[in-house]
Amino acid sequence: MSNPRVYFDITIGNKPEGRIVFELFKDIVPKTAENFRALCTGEKGEGKSGKPLSYQGSLFHRIIKNFMIQGGDFTAGNGTGGESIYGEKFEDENFVLKHEKPFLLSMANAGPGTNGSQFFITTVPTPHLDGKHVVFGKVLKGKAVVRALENLETVSDRPVEDAVIAKCGELAEGEDDGIRASEDGDVYEEYPDDHEGPKEPNDVLQIATHLKDIGNTYFKKGDHANAAKKYLKAIRYLNEKPAFDENDPKELEGKFAAIKIPCYLNRSMCALKLGEYSECVKVTTTVLEYDSKYLKPTDITKAYFRRGSAKMNTRDFEGAIEDFEKAHEKDPEDAGIKKELANAKAKLAAKKQKEKSAYAKMFA
């Protein structure tokens, strides 16, 4: 019989984030695997604490980026509680499996022989934990959900937004895992480090081109949020090749730029549409700082115009005027640029007049 599969349905800030599916290594650590499996199904009823022996409704209470995410304290919710199906604590079963890669399930503890219900999922290799914590499973699907949890904002390692195991359970042998295949054609892991396929430069170019095309489809439909995600994802894959040297084909850097620059510019337009003005400023600045030999005049014009538009929305009229003037220099005939430049100047003049009147009243 194959190893058990279990799942968590995760919410972040009360919004569904997705499902994580685990394999439990019953063949190597049967007692530890059974504890986790039963806590996913809740089949053991109430524990000695008077709380249900179940992960359902419990939090990920401790998250450390580039290390691990920790949960399983369903009694106290802060890392001080939890309970196993065998009583409060049980012994370390064995240390056969090592913390040699991300997405492993391992038992949290307070020292030897103190396993309860708390667990963690590694997000990087953590060999310093070998011989101290029992590895008992791995993530099969839902790596992007783990990364979303890992990247949550925290204060003293606790997520600012509640990250909750809203539902959990066991999947029968042969049962569908409940994770829908991507409908938009995006079959790639959210982060390149988690992508198990080839990642040579030409592979990355192909992936990024596909993601950009998917982003463009969303953009044309007016779905700017999903379009933005695809453009950012494409950029993440392109960043797998952060630098170029004399050993690279001469045309390679240009091929990367030909995809990356449009992704940045499209992301900046999405940011404008979504009201993410600081993000728009950041992304367009990245474009303007790009190696100039790969920037077309229209790229520069778009970047200045969109950055100016973002600054207008944050009432930085002087900054907007500066950017619109630079866009106007690149394309003197563009009526839209002329209009926004005049608008920015009028807004700045009105602001100064208002400030002048306020000062006059103060000293009247």
UniProtKB/Swiss-Prot annotation:
UniProt keyword annotations, A-Z: Cytoplasm, Isomerase, Repeat, Rotamase, TPR repeat
Signal sequence annotation: none
Enzyme class at the top of the EC tree: isomerase
Calcium found in the keyword field: no
Chemical reaction(s) catalysed: [protein]-peptidylproline (omega=180) = [protein]-peptidylproline (omega=0)
Disulfide bonds: none
Cellular component per GO, a single term: intracellular membrane-bounded organelle
Subcellular location as annotated: Cytoplasm
PROSITE patterns: CSA_PPIASE_1, CSA_PPIASE_2, TPR, TPR_REGION
Gene3D superfamilies: Cyclophilin-like, Tetratricopeptide repeat domain
Record-level Gene Ontology MF annotations: cyclosporin A binding; peptidyl-prolyl cis-trans isomerase activity; ribosome binding; unfolded protein binding
Enzyme Commission code: 5.2.1.8
Function text: PPIases accelerate the folding of proteins. It catalyzes the cis-trans isomerization of proline imidic peptide bonds in oligopeptides.
Full protein name: Peptidyl-prolyl cis-trans isomerase D
Organism: Rhizopus delemar (strain RA 99-880 / ATCC MYA-4621 / FGSC 9543 / NRRL 43880) (Mucormycosis agent)
Name of the gene this protein is made from: cyp12
